[in-house]
Amino acid sequence: MKSIFNTSSYYIIRAPLLPVSIYNTYLKNDEIDYSSFFQNKIIEETILTTTYHLYQSLTNISFDSETKKVRNAKESFLKYLIRMSTRGTPYGLLSGISLGQLAEKTNIQIQEDVNYYYKSVKVDGSWLSKLIHFLESNYDYYQDSYVIWNERNYITDQRIYLDNQTCLIQENNKELVSIKNNDLLKFIKQSLQEDLTFKDLIKLISEKFLINDEQEIKSFIQNLLDKEIIFTSLRTALKKENPLDYLLCFYRDFDNDFIRSLQLIHFEMMKYQIMEIGKGKKTFLRIRELMSHLFKAKEYIQIDTKIQTKNNYLSKKIAGNISEAAYLLWLLSPDDLGISTNHDFHYSFLEKYGLEQIVNLKELLSDINGMGYCTNEDKPIKNNSSFLKEKYYYALSHKEEIEITENDFLDLEKKNTIPIERAPLSSEIYSEFYYGNCINGYDEFLVISPIVSSFNAGATMGRFSQEIDRDIRKQLDNEIYEQYIEYSNENNTEVIHINEIPKYARNLNINHSGTTKFKELDLDMPCSSITLDDLYVGSTFDKLYLFSKTSNSRILFITHSMLNYVLCSNLYRFLREVSLGNTKFIQPIKDDGIEGFNYCPRIRYKNVILKPATWILNKDMFSSSEKENWIEQFHKIQQFYNIPNDVTMAFGDNRLTINLSNDAHISILKKEIEKQGRVCLLEDFISKSNNDRVIEIVTPIYRKAKSNEKRITIPKNIYKRLETKREWLSIHLYIDESYQNEFLIQYIL
């Protein structure tokens, strides 16, 4: 079956720190030796660096005790032990990544000795945000940095409005900043047409406005910094692989206790980075202590891990099956195009501005003079597929899995009414790779992850150090760039990489995207390739689009980050949603008619399991919360639905492999059902495979057809707001409908 997607020549593997044998041999047993596990130096350091509070609890308890505190600590410890042996999604030292290439045959071998693994160590976003805020609050530290005018500022009616504040000021602050745009602010904005340090700016202000009191000017400048009307070029550090290294280079001529403390922290972090896992406990604790003396934070150190592989090749045949599975999932996805909130905004835009003019972005999104931001929540996507229902009922009646054949695939393709140009231009498919003959006729198989895909290729790899697999990383980055360049040339569209300082400090960890060949819009940071004032919004009959006057082309924003844009600023979200346009996304398999049932059989295409067998457990299935009665009821439910012992418990993006014959595992399940109200149990494949490690695969895919649509003719007319004058007289006439035409002809025309 031919797919509309090509797979990349490269892929990402993600694997846990420990082999599957740890889970199978020790963690499925009723008697787990927690003390021995915690005495293992590698495991101890992994817990220490991942969850410091749990590390403290485990250090201060007797594992033989049966108090509630000890039981809770052991249960949390068990979850982490299971995760570090069964789940590959990157998380500190628990699991890591590596880059691989396609070949004729699959050959993935992960190095067993973790001493060969590589740690990338830097300051955590929680602490880094406090550091930058401190530096921007003390003139001595920012006087030689450049003054940056905040691109978000909207100026109108002699006032400046700013509708967003970053985590550097206050997390989740939703207050609108509004200040008078006086002559001094106008002078500052005009002066910043050229690079200007704060020290030079104060001198210019003093000369221009004849202010002799330098402290008065400094206080005014600090007030602007506190409101983020302006900010410092020190924020460039947030874009760097090693922010602390960048800042220390800037302060190389400083000699005081604070800078010496930063230098010592940096030295200890670089020392810790090259230490073998399991030998860095004392150094890590020393770094935490040094950092906490400067600023208290939720977390202090961010660690990413590169796993070492002996061989890392995925067969081209498997890659081809991934591209076919991606196409099949796209065909089975709901036919909703784009984001529902964007649809509502589009309709309102058409009513107010029409098709024959473009509107300045900042004016459009202003609550004062424009439409403001869409406040509606994204509507849940519904799917009602007769194909899936027929397959479901047939599988249930015959007690079989749901198999989608090539003939089914062809029928779905023939009945498809959505143009392939509405498929994602690029994406990434998440799956787990297994060796074994679980599926007849195949020696290898894939299981598509519950979170199926990303919004664009490159998003998953973005936050990881450029030092990880540098050569292959560069080739992958170039491949992605070439795909978008081809699209740009076909559609007169410029692709821009967008980034911002998030609302929540810890999101700085995943929002970092390293260097890129694309032009950039860095909100709340220096050195953007494009300005917000240059952006305009227009509309066709079916969607909104973004336009740049300078480049005279439409603009498409992408990101190399897995940060959910819903958690970002309203402006960032708007730019991303408009860029996604009328895309039909690759979604997990869901159907309104099937989702209401407690059981769904496995859904498979060839050797790709599109959805594992799934059982849904609700809190109202259990009449008693008393442990023994609850477990008895659970085993009756397990027997009735024929739920296997080896399953994966899933709620949201959280997944945990558990064994239902183990009391400790059932206790975890009970707590989650009572806490969440509902959990899913997914068929687990660890026991059905020959893997010595759980291997997650992230495969970039590209749509073959790059032409997206007929070229849009950009209107030459730019919307200009009518400036009302106070001396105008406004009269509203209310006339009976039957007399309106006569009145207009006789008195108005």
Please annotate each region the language model reported:
Residues 183-193:
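Positively charged, polyanion-binding regions of nucleic-acid-associated proteins
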Residues 120-175:
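Long, low-complexity, charged/polar intrinsically disordered regions in eukaryotic proteins
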Residues 451-675, 746:
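C-terminal structured domains
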Residues 1-122, 183, 203, 215-507, ...:
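Type-3 copper protein
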Residues 173, 206-218:
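Short, positively charged loop/turn segments that connect secondary-structure elements
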